[in-house]
Amino acid sequence: MLSLSQTLDAQLRAAMQRAFPDAEATLDPQLAAASKPEFGDFQANGALPLAKPLKQPPRQIATAIVDQLSGDEAFNALCLAPQIAGPGFINLTIRPERLAEELAARLGTDRLGVPVVEDVAPVVVDFSSPNIAKEMHVGHLRSTIIGDSLARVLEFRGHSVLRLNHVGDWGTQFGMLITHLKQVAPETLDTADAVDLGDLVAFYREAKKRFDDDDDFQATSRDEVVKLQGGDPVSLKAWGLLCDQSRREFQKLYDRLDIRLTERGESFYNPYLPAVLDGLKAVDLLVTDDGAQCVFLEGVTGKDGNPLPVIVQKRDGGFNYATTDLAAIRFRFASPPTGDAAQRVIYVTDAGQANHFAGVFQVAERAGWIPDGARLEHVPFGLVQGEDGKKLKTRAGDTVRLRDLLDEAVERSEQDLRSRLQEEERTESDAFISHVATTVGLAAVKYADLSQNRLTNYQFSFDRMLALQGNTAPYLLYAVVRIAGIARKGGDLGVSNAALQFSEPQEWALVRELLKFDRVIVEVEDELLPNRLCSYLFELSQVFNRFYDQVPVLKAEPEALSSRLALCRHTADTLRCGLALLGIPTLERM
């Protein structure tokens, strides 16, 4: 009901201006969706903050506003008579015929009432970002699917979105790994197919142990880093092969999860690192402290009360993550050809990096690298925990590999499906079982994560996420399947030109819920909280199921049939669209 609320907001502002033409206070109707159905569709709470400046009781102010609204023909065509409640709230109910018109305008459309944003702007979403020579684990799950969902919503709103994978493809670890492989398995550096990622991870662990225990190996590794940074062809070839092998393994997981990303690793920004120092020097932010080049933060102090530094060049002349992140921010906001010209840059990482990004963002802001009106945002998320409330681990105490987690989700989904088929005495092909199990299993993993407020930790449970009841992917997928079954039973779900007619309260409840979709999408775009969309889709499914269980559809009277089928069609379209924005495909049968 976004367009209706915007119209209503303008009408309320005009009424307030007419009621209080001499008011010096800001006249804001404070229009919001009604908190309960009995309060109507919207509530205007703007009378309360005017009580003090106008020196009038809020109910008296509300009455004056309502008196002005009563003479507004356009308002009367949109709303029923407003009601004043409590200390001065104005409850507003949209006329049923306007709700039906609004729904009719959305039927069969691709956008389902969601407007394209007026100010289209380039957006960068930085997410996933695994490290080369390491396998993706459960910790990468949240960044990958939260970032993908946010990118999908921003794209749906009309923004040009650059989905960046800031992979860890540079640093001391490569000197360490290349040195180790040259010494113990030189054949692995001949071709990218000579070693798989699992072996590479094992080699990395061996190299790390040698680096920590052996001073000579450590020195040789540092020399290898210098060669790599200097462009030594042998070192660069070895580095490229390691990156290619990891990249192929990452892509298998991205394909499986239907994730699109443009890789732009840390190494991309190497040529831009000296300019970071030059830029900070130019605005007198750079300070030498104990041989290192730093920027001291404003308003952030350590235990000793002194300002904390962001180190951008170590005392040995090397750069670090902060330098790379500053170079990335500068590039992403800069104009082409040496930048992305973004107006909004979003980083999706775990909450443990909040202080790091707060510091880096402050430095970039003070350096003048963030254009006026542009947005630079960190989207933090909590940990994935086991059912014991501790960080999710394997029984052996290792980090859970993402590949293994997805495999188990699909396996459990298939077990549940085969059990259900046996109970229902249904026979399905192996291809059907495989397709449904894969779709439901992966959807369950995604939805279980996205349905949680990303700011909190959440407990991972296969049993809960695969349940057919509750706020789960299977429950939502089944709602779509249920509607698809109407067509199989002879219901025409095609778009009809017949006027929509509703009489039952369950119908109107569903109409109102369907019309909330546009507002929810705009909220997710602004607040970057995918769980808002999940909550809406779950509520929509519940409202639809109550409608379908309590009101006849296929056996409806002729005058009601087409309108009820239209409700079913639009519910399915909304669920499919909403789930697609979460990266979840739907099914026709389960």
Curated annotation (Swiss-Prot):
Query: What CDD domains does its record include?
Result: Anticodon_Ia_Arg, ArgRS_core
Primary residence = cytoplasm
Source organism of the structure: Synechococcus sp. (strain CC9902)
Q: Which NCBIfam families match?
A: argS
Q: What is its EC number?
A: 6.1.1.19
Question: Which protein is depicted?
Answer: Arginine--tRNA ligase
Does the record carry Aminoacyl-tRNA synthetase as a key word?
A: yes
Q: How does it assemble?
A: Monomer.
